[in-house]
C-alpha cells in the first residue's frame, strides 16, 4: 500500500445536499453515529439488511432525537436495489459501516467475508461515481496493522498481512478506495481505523445488540455476570503483564463523534484520502476489564482459561494524535464510564422482547 503519500489538492465546495447515507446504520456503531449526525442537524438515510441488527433500533433512535431517519432494508450486494436509493435520495456523502465483522467466524468462513465486505464496497463506489457523490467515510479497523510489535501504532505503522480474513477485507477495502480515489478527479475519502468500540449510549436506549450469542468482550462479560455463568478467557501466555491480550477500548459515543468530525474535515480539506486511528491510547488486558466489571457490578465473575484463539492479536493500542490535531477530536469517556454504560444497556436490553 502507498500509505497515502500522494496527496492531491482538490477543490471542495459546500454542497447544498445534506443527506448522509449510513450503511449498517442500525448496527452498533452505525446507530450511535446516526444519532450523532441527526443531533448535528444532518438528514440521514440508513441502508441495512438487518443481518446483525434489529428494526426496533429505529424507534430507539426516534426516542433519543425526536424523529426517525429514512430507512431502506437492502443488502448492499444487490446493486440494483441500492441504485434505487441513490436515484430517490439527494445524497451528499456516504458513511460505510455495513460488513461482516467477526474475526473468528472469518477464519472459519473466509469466502463469506470476502464476498460480502468487498462486493458491497465496490457496489457503493460504482454508484457514488454514477451519481456524483464525492465523499466516502470508511469504517476501517486496527486489524489492518496485524499482529504488530510496534505499540502504540500510528498511521505510519506498516500495514502487515492480516491476522484474519476479516482484517484482510479491511486492508483490501482501503486499497480499493485508494485506487478509486486516485482514478477520480473528485472522489475524497477518510479511513477511520477503529480500535475496540465498547459501551452504550448515555440515554441507555441503544447499545451493542448482537443477533444470537454475543461475540465481543464487554457484552459477553456483562451477560456472564448477570447470568452467573462461566466466562472463558482465551490465552494466558501472551507477552503482556498478566498474560492476557491487551486492547485499546473506546466508548462508542466517542467513536460516533469522530465520524462527525471526519465528515466536517472532508468538507474543508483539500486532501483526497487520509487515514486516522481512533482510540484512546490506553491498553487494558482482559483481566483488567474483568476486574473493572467486578468492581462496578459488585459481583464476582467465574472464569476459566482456554487455549488461544486463531486470529487474536497479542496487544495493540492507538496513537490518535493525528485525529486530535486534524479532526479536533478527543475521546471523553473513561473505562469506568464504558463499563457502567454497558451494564445499564444490558439491563435495558434484557427487559425487551428483541
Q: Where are these predicted regions, by residue range?
A:
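Short, solvent-exposed loop/helix junctions and linker helices
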Residues: 23, 115-118, 211-215, 249-252, ...
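N-terminal Rossmann-like NAD(P)+-binding domain of SDR-like oxidoreductases, especially those catalyzing
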Residues: 4-200
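Short, flexible, glycine-rich and Lys/Arg-enriched loop motifs at helix boundaries
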Residues: 55, 195-217, 227-247
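C-terminal substrate-binding subdomain of Rossmann-fold SDR/epimerase-dehydratase oxidoreductases
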Residues: 223-354
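Pocket-edge positions in alpha/beta enzyme catalytic cores
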Residues: 74, 113, 161, 209, ...
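Short-chain dehydrogenase/reductase
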Residues: 114, 163-171, 207, 211-215, ...
Amino acid at each position: 500500500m502507498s500509505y497515502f503519500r500522494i496527496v492531491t489538492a482538490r477543490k471542495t465546495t459546500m454542497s447544498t445536499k445534506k443527506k448522509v447515507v449510513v450503511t449498517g446504520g442500525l448496527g452498533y456503531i452505525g446507530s450511535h453515529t446516526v444519532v450523532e449526525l441527526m443531533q448535528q442537524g444532518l438528514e440521514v438515510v440508513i441502508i441495512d439488511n438487518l443481518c446483525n441488527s434489529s428494526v426496533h433500533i429505529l424507534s430507539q433512535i426516534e426516542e433519543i432525537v425526536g424523529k426517525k431517519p429514512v430507512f431502506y432494508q437492502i443488502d448492499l450486494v444487490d446493486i440494483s436495489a441500492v441504485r434505487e436509493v441513490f436515484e430517490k435520495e439527494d445524497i451528499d456523502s456516504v458513511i460505510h459501516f455495513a460488513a461482516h465483522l467477526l474475526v473468528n467466524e472469518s477464519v472459519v468462513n473466509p469466502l463469506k467475508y470476502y464476498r460480502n465486505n468487498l462486493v458491497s464496497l465496490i457496489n457503493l463506489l460504482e454508484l457514488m461515481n454514477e451519481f456524483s457523490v464525492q465523499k466516502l467515510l470508511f469504517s476501517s479497523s486496527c486489524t489492518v496493522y496485524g499482529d504488530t510489535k510496534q505499540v502504540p501504532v500510528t498511521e505510519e505503522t506498516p500495514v502487515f498481512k492480516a491476522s484474519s480474513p476479516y482484517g484482510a477485507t479491511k486492508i483490501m477495502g482501503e486499497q480499493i478506495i485508494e485506487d478509486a480515489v486516485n482514478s477520480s478527479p473528485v472522489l475524497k475519502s477518510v479511513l477511520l481505523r477503529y480500535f475496540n468500540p465498547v459501551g452504550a449510549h448515555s440515554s441507555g436506549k441503544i447499545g451493542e445488540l448482537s443477533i444470537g450469542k454475543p461475540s465481543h468482550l464487554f457484552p459477553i462479560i456483562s451477560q456472564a455476570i448477570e447470568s452467573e455463568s462461566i466466562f472463558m478467557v482465551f490465552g494466558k501466555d501472551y507477552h503482556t503483564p498478566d498474560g492476557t491480550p491487551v486492547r485499546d477500548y473506546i466508548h462508542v459515543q466517542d467513536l460516533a463523534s469522530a465520524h462527525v468530525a471526519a465528515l466536517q474535515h472532508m468538507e474543508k480539506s483539500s486532501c483526497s484520502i487520509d487515514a486516522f486511528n481512533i482510540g484512546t491510547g490506553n491498553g487494558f488486558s482482559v483481566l483488567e476489564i474483568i476486574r473493572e466489571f467486578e468492581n462496578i457490578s459488585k459481583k464476582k465473575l467465574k472464569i476459566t482459561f482456554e487455549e488461544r484463539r486463531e486470529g487474536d492479536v497479542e496487544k495493540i493500542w492507538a496513537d490518535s494524535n493525528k485525529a486530535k490535531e486534524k479532526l479536533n477530536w478527543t475521546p471523553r469517556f473513561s473505562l469506568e464510564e464504558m463499563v457502567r454504560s454497558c451494564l445499564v444497556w444490558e439491563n435495558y436490553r434484557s427487559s425487551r422482547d428483541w
